[in-house]
């Protein structure tokens, strides 16, 4: 009863009034909704008063989304209505990309706009053919002799699409002392292009490292008074996070709004971008309805009051990992797993005793439903929900693709729980591991490997034995995005974790291991992120063991990590900016195009 009274005093009405599209009527919270969100049923889950009093609490923010509202719309009809119009516009854009008479720089800028506006997935083969034509006809050599903007733009696009191009292309823009020419800074468009290209660097490419420093130093000196509002917005946007590290859907909505302000905007391209964005958003809404119904049916959020309920944030994360409309299965699978990860992480980090955590880890390793008999009640619910969900995913894969993936899914979960358990032991022992010991475990506890293994089986149609073997060994395409996931997470959450008494974090471990200040440790972690990106960039240059769709999915996980943790831990404590982003991607369509 005490728990119910405490929760009912919270301003519940806020969760129904904030962070969603405004409606012409006020939606009132029903008593049932209040009870589900704020109380723990003692009929099915029993905790003794002693246990409740001695358990830790992280005081996480409650869920602030209205599932009833999110589930209310029917979007399938709107998708069908716009398909024919989109096909006609797509055909017009395709003709422009395939125009062999177009000047190369004009073609490159068209491709760049297509990708920024979120349309790249529609024109993958066309873009590849255009770039093949550009390279085979000597276009790259010609562009590098004319302008820095053309050189940087073509370099970035070619590397994005797996072409091997040398950093030496930028040597012609340096003086006899090896410094970039000072007069280049007068061309802001060129400096922006150089800045974006520098983030496609590989290990040891010093020219690109120097290019990044040069570009950043000059871009930071610019002011709106000097370059105008439109260009200043582009510079600010780029400096916040480079294009190569941005999530596709957020970049699309930003680029559409920026592009529609241009006087020379390609109106056909703009109309297609808006139409496509809204159509894909309708697919997301359909996916979210399915995932939300599953989450409500599972009911963990209403039973485990100590844990974070982050289904919407998890689905938003999944959109960042696999945005293309055809990957609904991947989005639903990743969203479900991240929702489970969030709750189980709270069991290990906050609520469970060490003995209980060892029992839960053993149950996951055994993957035997009878193991629930050894678990406390709150863990029984969690384990059985996890057990049923993963078995269902494995069954669907066996039915649709003829492959038994259950051993790979359960191993991924066992590895994750063992990583969680190790962190719990450090916490209970109040010990701070060395950075190497910590990080060797922490990139696995990020849940990146688990998410990517589930994503692999959802994205890849023809499952190959060699790929599965490398997945189990946590191939670089699994580990490196997970490294970035962990490092970004740790940068965002270090202060809160230290306040809770958790001593294992990349920053704190680096401070202790190297004997340096928090400021220097933070800088070192940021440098590690940059170096990891250089290693990961190599996967885009062809020759990867894995097919391009999965490589992009894995890299997208790193991008979503930047998005989620760039301004704090937006998964644990979603702020208004995060909620606006979620709405813009999932529920708020872009205003229609007007000629």
From Swiss-Prot:
Q: Which SUPFAM superfamilies match?
A: Terpenoid cyclases/Protein prenyltransferases, Terpenoid synthases
Q: What is its EC number?
A: 4.2.3.27
List residues binding Mg(2+) 1.
345, 349
What is written in the cofactor note of this entry?
Answer: Binds 3 Mg(2+) or Mn(2+) ions per subunit.
Q: Please list the GO biological process terms of this entry.
A: diterpenoid biosynthetic process
The keyword Lyase appears for this protein: yes
Molecular function per GO: isoprene synthase activity; magnesium ion binding
Record's signal peptide: none
Predominant location category: plastid
Q: Which InterPro entries match?
A: Isoprenoid_synthase_dom_sf, Terpene_cyclase_plant_C1, Terpene_synth_N, Terpene_synth_N_sf, Terpene_synthase-like, Terpene_synthase_metal-bd, Terpenoid_cyclase/PrenylTrfase
Q: Which UniProt keywords apply?
A: Chloroplast, Lyase, Magnesium, Metal-binding, Plastid, Transit peptide
**Gene Ontology annotations for the cellular component aspect, listed alphabetically:** chloroplast
* Membrane-spanning segments: none
Coiled-coil region list: none
Q: Spell out the disulfide connections.
A: none
Q: What is known of its domains?
A: The Asp-Asp-Xaa-Xaa-Asp/Glu (DDXXD/E) motif is important for the catalytic activity, presumably through binding to Mg(2+).
Report what the protein is called.
Isoprene synthase, chloroplastic
Species, as recorded: Populus tremuloides (Quaking aspen)
Name of the gene encoding the protein in the UniProt record = ISPS
């Amino acid at each position: 009863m005490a728990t119910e009274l405490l929760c009912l005093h919270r301003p519940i009405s806020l969760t129904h009034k904030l962070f969603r599209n405004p409606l012409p009527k006020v939606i009132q919270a029903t008593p049932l909704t209040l009870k589900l969100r704020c109380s723990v049923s003692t009929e099915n889950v029993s905790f003794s008063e002693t246990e409740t009093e001695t358990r830790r609490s992280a005081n996480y923010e409650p869920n602030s989304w209205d599932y009833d509202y999110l589930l209310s719309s029917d979007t399938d009809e709107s998708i069908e209505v716009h398909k024919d119009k989109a096909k006609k516009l797509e055909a017009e854009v395709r003709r422009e990309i395939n125009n062999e008479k177009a000047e190369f720089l004009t073609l490159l800028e068209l491709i760049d706009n297509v990708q920024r506006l979120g349309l790249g997935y529609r024109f993958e083969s066309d873009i590849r053919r255009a770039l093949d034509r550009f390279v085979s006809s000597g276009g790259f050599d010609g562009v590098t002799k004319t302008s820095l903007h053309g050189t940087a733009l073509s370099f970035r696009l070619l590397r994005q699409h797996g072409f091997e191009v040398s950093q030496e292309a930028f040597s012609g823009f340096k003086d006899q002392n090896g410094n970039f020419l000072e007069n280049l800074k007068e061309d802001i468009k060129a400096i922006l292009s150089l800045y974006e290209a520098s983030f496609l660097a590989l290990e040891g490419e010093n020219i690109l490292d120097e290019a990044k420093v040069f570009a950043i130093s000059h871009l930071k000196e610019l002011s709106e008074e000097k370059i105008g509002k439109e260009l200043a917005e582009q510079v600010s946007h780029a400096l916040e996070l480079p294009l190569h590290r941005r999530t596709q859907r957020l970049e699309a909505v930003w680029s559409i709004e920026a592009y529609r302000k241009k006087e020379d905007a390609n109106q056909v391209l703009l109309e297609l971008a808006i139409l496509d964005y809204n159509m894909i958003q309708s697919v997301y809404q359909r996916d979210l309805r399915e995932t939300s119904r599953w989450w409500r049916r599972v009911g963990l959020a209403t039973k485990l009051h100590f844990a974070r309920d982050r289904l919407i944030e998890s689905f938003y994360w999944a959109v960042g990992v696999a945005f293309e409309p055809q990957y609904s299965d991947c989005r639903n699978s990743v969203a479900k797993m991240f929702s489970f990860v969030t709750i189980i992480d709270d069991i290990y980090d906050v609520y469970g005793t060490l003995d209980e955590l060892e029992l839960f880890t053993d149950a996951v390793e055994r993957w035997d439903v009878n193991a629930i008999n050894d678990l406390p009640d709150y863990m029984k619910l969690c384990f059985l929900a996890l057990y049923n969900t993963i078995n269902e995913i494995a069954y669907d894969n066996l039915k649709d693709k003829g492959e038994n993936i259950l051993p790979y899914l359960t191993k991924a979960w066992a590895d994750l729980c063992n990583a969680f358990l190790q962190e719990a032991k450090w916490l209970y022992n109040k010990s701070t591991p060395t950075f190497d010991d910590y990080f060797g475990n922490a990139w696995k506890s990020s849940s990146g490997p688990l998410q990517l293994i589930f994503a692999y089986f959802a994205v890849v149609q023809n499952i190959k034995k060699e790929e599965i073997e490398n997945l189990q060994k946590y191939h670089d395409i699994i580990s490196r995005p997970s490294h970035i996931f962990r490092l970004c997470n740790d940068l965002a959450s270090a202060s809160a974790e230290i306040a809770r008494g958790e001593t294992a974090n990349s920053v704190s471990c680096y401070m202790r291991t190297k004997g340096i200040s928090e400021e220097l440790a933070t800088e070192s972690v940021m440098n590690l992120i940059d170096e990891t990106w250089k290693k990961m960039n190599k996967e885009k240059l062809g020759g990867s063991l894995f097919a391009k769709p999965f490589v992009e999915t894995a890299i997208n996980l790193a991008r979503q990590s930047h998005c989620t943790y760039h301004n704090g831990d937006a998964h644990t404590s979603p702020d208004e900016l995060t909620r606006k982003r979620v709405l813009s991607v999932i529920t708020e369509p872009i205003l229609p195009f007007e000629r």
